[in-house]
């Protein structure tokens, strides 16, 4: 039910588009051309509260199932959140649309956890998705019946789920053996954009945290470089395989058999010229020999890459792997404990798996981004599993951009054919809602 919406930024309060309904009709009804549907542009829609459920399956061994009290506590938090949205003018009036909720909860996945964390003590994850649908009636057996489905743009408010890498690329993975998922290392998401004082990570997901807590934790340089070494190795191996193919092609091109093959081909296609037109025959022979010399020179040049623009495809990954191996082998314990960062080098040829350098923080200049991983130490197990400790709004950026502290949403077409729904409804609700009340839903 999530449908992407393309938008052009316009400020809220822009000139209203023309509408297709009779302004004197109290419901603003517009019947579709086939007569099977009608849209109620002015009718106040309902707010359908979701029932908290877990569609993701039972918890794995060692994790207790959610108790009735925990389910009640999670549901109370989601109801309090919904009340904040419903308290806005847009959320309370709901002219032309209805709101449908989806309330879900799930358990932490033990194979994802770093060592030292007990899955049974980590909080339950729960969320509420909001789906604004325009009011539509369907004609069934001569009776108009209100529809309660369709497609729209949903946005989820997710509690107790760490934001993770968001839109950052995973730089390296720390393998941990069978039955455990690797730990992912990635650049810290960009938190420079804020809305109402809260960061909008990578311009997409709004994040509310408990004061002083960071949902990411720095990756030690030693761990990061060790995990990244297989990626450097992949690029080195790719370069070596390509070089081996070029060496093979060089040997074939320099062989007497290759020359004989070219002479045989010339004889087959132009041999009659030897007696019919000797001068032309000599010209063909000279041309073939020039081609042979060119092919051999080219094959030798490609099979012996130099440290220049033409040979960077080989030397860049070879040198990068050698440098990373040397740094890892000579690293002191003090160096290994320093935070790591990643310096991207998008222009380097031959770098496909590892498109940059893992370095110690402070050694890569201003372009070296801090490497982080999920911080499960963010959660306080003393608060109880159903306590709200972090909130991520996924994804505010699908519907709006932050411009000078305000949300800029999708522009409305000059002539609306259907009542506005989805992002057209989310954005004004967000602009009108009390985000400090939302923050207060988190444990102090």
Regions found by a protein language model. Give the residues of each.
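Surface-exposed amphipathic alpha-helical segments
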Residues: 407-444
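Boundary of Sec targeting at the N-terminus
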Residues: 15-17
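Aromatic-rich peripheral "rim/lid" segments of glycoside hydrolase catalytic domains that contact
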Residues: 28
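Short, well-ordered beta-strand elements
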Residues: 388-420
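Bacterial N-terminal signal peptides
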Residues: 2-13
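Short, solvent-exposed recognition patches
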Residues: 32, 38-389, 395-399
């Amino acid at each position: 039910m999530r449908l992407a919406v393309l938008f052009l930024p316009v400020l809220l309060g822009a000139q209203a588009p023309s509408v297709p309904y009779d302004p004197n009709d109290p419901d603003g009804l517009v019947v579709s051309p086939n007569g099977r549907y009608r849209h109620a542009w002015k009718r106040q829609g309902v707010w359908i509260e979701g029932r908290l459920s877990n569609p993701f399956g039972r918890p794995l061994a060692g994790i207790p199932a959610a108790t009735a009290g925990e389910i009640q506590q999670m549901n109370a938090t989601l109801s309090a959140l919904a009340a904040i949205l419903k308290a806005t003018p847009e959320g309370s009036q709901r002219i032309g649309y209805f709101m449908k909720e989806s309330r879900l909860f799930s358990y932490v996945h033990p194979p994802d956890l770093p060592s030292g964390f007990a899955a049974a003590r980590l909080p339950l994850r729960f969320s509420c998705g909001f789906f604004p649908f325009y009011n539509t009636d369907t004609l069934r057996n001569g009776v108009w019946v209100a529809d309660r489905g369709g497609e729209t743009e949903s946005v989820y408010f997710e509690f107790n789920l760490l934001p993770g890498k968001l839109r950052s690329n995973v730089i390296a993975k720390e393998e941990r053996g069978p039955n455990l998922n690797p730990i992912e290392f990635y650049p810290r998401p960009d938190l420079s954009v804020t809305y109402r004082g809260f960061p909008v990570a990578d311009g997409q997901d709004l994040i509310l945290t408990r004061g002083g807590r960071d949902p990411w934790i720095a990756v030690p340089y030693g761990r990061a470089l060790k995990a990244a070494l297989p990626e450097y190795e992949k690029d080195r191996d790719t370069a070596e395989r390509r070089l081996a193919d070029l060496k093979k092609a060089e040997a074939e091109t320099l062989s007497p058999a290759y020359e004989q093959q070219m002479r045989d081909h010339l004889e087959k296609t132009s041999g009659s010229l030897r007696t019919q037109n000797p001068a032309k025959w000599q010209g063909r022979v000279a041309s073939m020999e020039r081609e042979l010399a060119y092919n051999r020179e080219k094959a030798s040049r490609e099979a012996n890459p130099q440290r220049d623009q033409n040979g960077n495809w080989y030397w860049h990954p070879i040198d990068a792997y050698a440098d990373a191996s040397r740094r890892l082998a000579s690293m002191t314990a003090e160096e290994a404990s320093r935070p790591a960062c990643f310096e991207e080098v998008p222009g380097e040829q031959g770098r496909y798996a590892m498109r940059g350098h893992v370095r110690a923080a402070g050694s890569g200049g201003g372009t070296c981004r801090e490497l982080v991983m999920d911080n499960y130490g963010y959660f306080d197990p003393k608060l109880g599993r159903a306590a709200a400790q972090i909130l991520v709004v996924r994804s505010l950026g699908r519907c709006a951009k932050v411009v000078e502290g305000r949300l800029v949403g999708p522009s409305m077409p000059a002539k609306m054919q259907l009542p506005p729904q989805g992002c057209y409804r989310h954005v004004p609700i967000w602009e009108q809602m009390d985000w400090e009340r939302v923050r207060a839903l988190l444990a102090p």
